[in-house]
Curated annotation (Swiss-Prot):
GO terms for molecular function: cytoskeletal motor activity; structural molecule activity. Belongs to the FliE family. NCBIfam families: fliE. This is Flagellar hook-basal body complex protein FliE. InterPro entries: FliE (IPR001624).
Amino acid sequence: MAAIQGIEGVISQLQATAMAARGQDTHSQSTVSFAGQLHAALDRISDRQAAARVQAEKFTLGEPGIALNDVMADMQKASVSMQMGIQVRNKLVAAYQEVMSMQV
């Protein structure tokens, strides 16, 4: 769900840029920087991994109330969010390389 919010932020940024290029008023939409959205997404990925790691440690130590299925689900969520982050990075690098290879 957090990944979708990050993507929605990027989409709203692109829409605001497109509206500005057409000369339309963009004050009705909130302005969110791309770097800010990217940083927030990376923070969420890091937080999710840290929470999964802590829960795994608690399970290993035998704390009551920590079930194996919860630990495994949190570890999978952290893994999926990390893979999503890697894919976003790969797409950004590919887009950057494409822009840099354009002739002026």
